Amino acid sequence: MEKIPSFQLDHIRLKRGIYVSRKDYIGGEVVTTFDIRMKEPNREPVLGAPELHTIEHLAATYLRNHPLYKDRIVFWGPMGCLTGNYFLMRGNYVSKDILPLMQETFRFIRDFEGEVPGTEPRDCGNCLLHNLPMAKYEAEKYLREVLDVATEENLNYPD
């Protein structure tokens, strides 16, 4: 079998950031898939499953309720490697286009107080797998170290 494009990416040189992973053309529309990379692959500890699950719930809720973008949001979900998330939006975007939206999203997560949306047994397939304090910690770290100081190497995959 052929290696899929995401496995051809040089993960050794990959930094934390926001990257366009792919663009799919469906009918007359483009769906842009973003790699929201929160950890450097194979060089730092991955995100714990509980905090990544909480980030998923909070980011998906925030984005699907966003007054400007809610109709363009297709999907937000964790990567199996636990180094970040995939984010799909309807439209033809580059990473820089969504940097302000990601800053807003991660500030929302960092500042969130109260019960995490969708964490009741009837709402979630693993409602006990959550960690709000660690999700807030990881959101703050990603904001401070990556999103708020992003350069081209955090917005474009390495060649």
UniProtKB/Swiss-Prot annotation:
One of its GO terms (biological process) is quorum sensing. Involved in the synthesis of autoinducer 2 (AI-2) which is secreted by bacteria and is used to communicate both the cell density and the metabolic potential of the environment. The regulation of gene expression in response to changes in cell density is called quorum sensing. Catalyzes the transformation of S-ribosylhomocysteine (RHC) to homocysteine (HC) and 4,5-dihydroxy-2,3-pentadione (DPD). InterPro entries: LuxS_sf, Metalloenz_LuxS/M16, S-ribosylhomocysteinase. It comes from Porphyromonas gingivalis (strain ATCC 33277 / DSM 20709 / CIP 103683 / JCM 12257 / NCTC 11834 / 2561). The keyword Cell wall biogenesis/degradation does not apply. Homodimer. Fe cation binds at H53, H57, C124. NCBIfam families: PRK02260.1-4. One of its GO terms (molecular function) is iron ion binding. It holds the Pfam family LuxS. Signal peptide: none annotated. Coiled coil: none annotated. Its EC number is 4.4.1.21. Belongs to the LuxS family. It is an enzyme of class 4 (lyase). This is S-ribosylhomocysteine lyase. Its cofactor is Fe cation. It catalyses: S-(5-deoxy-D-ribos-5-yl)-L-homocysteine = (S)-4,5-dihydroxypentane-2,3-dione + L-homocysteine. The gene is luxS. Binds 1 Fe cation per subunit. Keywords: Autoinducer synthesis, Iron, Lyase, Metal-binding, Quorum sensing. It comes from the Bacteria.
